[in-house]
Amino acid sequence: MQTHSESKYRYLFGNIIAFLCGNMGTRMIGFLMVPLYTHMLLPAEYGEMDLLLSVAGVISPLLACGIHEGIMRFALDKGADHSLVLSIGLRVFAIAAVAFLPVCALLEAIPILGGNGWFLYGYCVLNELMTIMLCYIRGCDNTRLYAFLGFLSALFTALLNIIFLVVLGMGLGGYKTSMLLSPVCTVAAAFLMGRVKRDFHPGKWHTGLAREMLRYSMVLIPNALLWWCMNASDRFFVSYLCGTAANGIYAVSYKLPTLLSTVAAICMQAWQMSAIREHEERADHRFSQEIYVLLTFFMGLVTQLMLLVNKGLLRIYVSEAYQSAWLYSGPLMIAFFAGSLGTFWGSFYIAQKRMKKYLLSAVAGAMVNVLLNLCLIPWIGVMGAAAATLASYVVVWWVRAAGIQKDVGVALVSRPLISAFACSAAGMLAAYMTEPWSVALGVAAMAVYVVVNRAYVLSLLHRGKAVLHTWRKRQ
């Protein structure tokens, strides 16, 4: 008979597998498309597009008051009226999208954006609508469809880019066109395949619930903007102080760390749903503690593996003009490792809807990021931006953990945590040495990490076998 603990792991691992199938396919498509972009676009063009997408990261949270976050969280509540949640969310989105039209004139007038105001507005509106659809499907606990639609979105983007960049040879204009058409295709697929068509009723409204959803979502607007500061403001500093070509190379340096971020996102999307369940069931803290330790070990292992293959992979992955990007990937990988830990602690705030305290961590991280960008980029160039990102992610993780650790009963410091940071730092520094020493020391750092944490290797294998055994019995 399946125990309560086993059912928790089954639910968590089941969601991880669903998100893995969708997200890894999505990221792999995006990852494999980068060589096409770097061959078809000049570094300055790639840097310009990266800058526009960074600006879109500021506009998107403001556009619809972050209502997609409220849709997902309130749809996950026990006994939620999904139709009402969706109808409120789409009405808020429609009103906000129309109200935001005058901002286009302001965007057109900003010189650095090069007259791309209407493109930014269209891109943000279409992507926000797509995000609302996906968040609603996820909020209905339909993780398989959510993951599949995410994969489909990436596939649409890839196919459209091949058509406009390679077949039609439209250059940067073709890249922009594909970025507008891809979310349209995904929205159509979500509308037809999900419950959106059945559940949306324009006349359905509840003022009390709408206020709750907006209150929850609007706190996340400054949070999203502050995360933008940590993730994208360095692009502006690098573009201004080092040039758009340097920013294009820096943008490529994010590609391998983004794969690490994808692994973390898969685990965290699944964990967030488990954390909400744990909160609603008033469960004890042992499950959360076990997951935190295992997550720390696993993400530390993935980080060191990525550090080991970073330099060699970029040599065959991008054109020669971009190959110096490996220099900046190391600090970004460790930053994303710290970010995955911060996201774990953030899930407790989301489960308890304690959004003001959640916001404080982003404030601290953004302040550190901007200050260090101002100080370090003029001094050490692009490496200063990578170092600032690393420091800001560590600050967010620490502030979040310190703010809620006692309430959730999860220990912050563990053997996997200390060894992960130590061995990852050793692996990062080894990469700057000449070969074969860099490879040898990187492998040695990973071997030490596995030996020190061998008990957690066995624990992961044991849990995985138990879940597989349960699934086989149900077949």
Where are these regions (language model features)?
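Helix-loop junctions and terminal segments of transmembrane helices
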Residues: L63-G79, P257-Y292, G346-A351
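Membrane-proximal transmembrane or re-entrant/amphipathic helices at the cytosolic face
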Residues: Q2-H4, A431-Q475
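Hydrophobic alpha-helical transmembrane segments
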Residues: L149-V196, V363-V368, V382-G403, V443-Y449
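Signature of the first transmembrane helix
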Residues: K8-H68, A154-A158, I162, R215-A245
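Membrane-interface junctions at transmembrane-helix termini in multi-pass inner-membrane proteins
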Residues: F74, N127-L152, M333-A364, I404-K406
